[in-house]
Amino acid sequence: MDLIAQLEAEQIAALGKDIPDFKAGDTIRVGYKVTEGTRSRVQNYEGVCISRKNGSGIAGSFTVRKISFGEGVERVFPLYSTNIDSITVVRRGRVRRAKLYYLRARRGKSARIAEVANYKPKADAEA
């Protein structure tokens, strides 16, 4: 392991975050910490992951797209941000691309993603 990869691994271990295994096409729920004045709360942002950049390293990020009141809204989250409270995979999608930018031009049924039928979360598989 080279020096940079070793430093990244140390930083990831120091953060102690549990990032689930997800990829483009998966529907995920991101619990994001929002500060309003003096109060802080967790706001859930649920949508389809349309891209992941820079892998699972410390500089990695992912883009989540959702339709809010008829408008498409995309948000880019750094993977190891301190503002991210939790990431949960709601459902697995079956796609054949790594970047799903073509969903931006689609509306309605054509923007749907097929669900992986035989997906079982790791907690259920062990039980």
Curated annotation (Swiss-Prot):
User: What are the disulphide bonds in this sequence?
Assistant: none
Q: Which Gene3D superfamilies match?
A: 2.30.30.790
UniProt keyword list: Ribonucleoprotein, Ribosomal protein
Keyword Transmembrane helix set for record: no
Q: What GO biological process terms are annotated to this protein in UniProt?
A: translation
Gene Ontology molecular-function annotations: structural constituent of ribosome
**InterPro entries attached to this UniProt entry:** Ribosomal_bL19, Ribosomal_bL19_CS, Ribosomal_bL19_sf, Translation_prot_SH3-like_sf
Q: Which HAMAP family match?
A: Ribosomal_bL19
The record's NCBIfam families line, in alphabetical order, gives: rplS_bact
The record's family statement is: Belongs to the bacterial ribosomal protein bL19 family.
What this chain does, per the entry, is described as:
This protein is located at the 30S-50S ribosomal subunit interface and may play a role in the structure and function of the aminoacyl-tRNA binding site.
Q: What is this protein called?
A: Large ribosomal subunit protein bL19
Q: Which gene is annotated as encoding this protein in its UniProt record? A: rplS
